[in-house]
């Protein structure tokens, strides 16, 4: 992952607007590819095909149990994978669920691009 321009990041987001925000924030570092609707098998297959080391998983109150299970399952299958949760930064329960599931960090939707890019740079150095 020394060539940051060739990085591919996977994302499971609430909607296309969130995906576009993430793509814009990470455009200087690589490309963000949608990982579909949240199927573990689909996510793991995409990780294998794209060699992505970092996955963004959107969390919301309605689906937090399934989304947390997805994070846990992905990390169980791919322990070296880094997962960053996305969600409402004001919702402490989402943040707690993300951390308990094994996410490395939590990013609030709409955060400044520089914050997101800085986080990804730091995480990429550890991968």
Positions of predicted regions on the chain:
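Conserved phosphotransfer microenvironments
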Residues: 42-43, 53-74
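C-terminal output helix
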Residues: 111-119
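A short, hydrophobic beta-strand element within the central beta-sheet of small alpha/beta folds
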Residues: 80-90
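Alpha4-beta5-alpha5 "output face"
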Residues: 75, 96-100
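Conserved acidic segment of CheY-like receiver
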Residues: 2-26, 35, 55-56
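The C-terminal output helix
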Residues: 121-127
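Short hydrophobic/Thr-rich beta-strand motif most characteristic of the beta2 strand and flanking loop
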Residues: 31-39
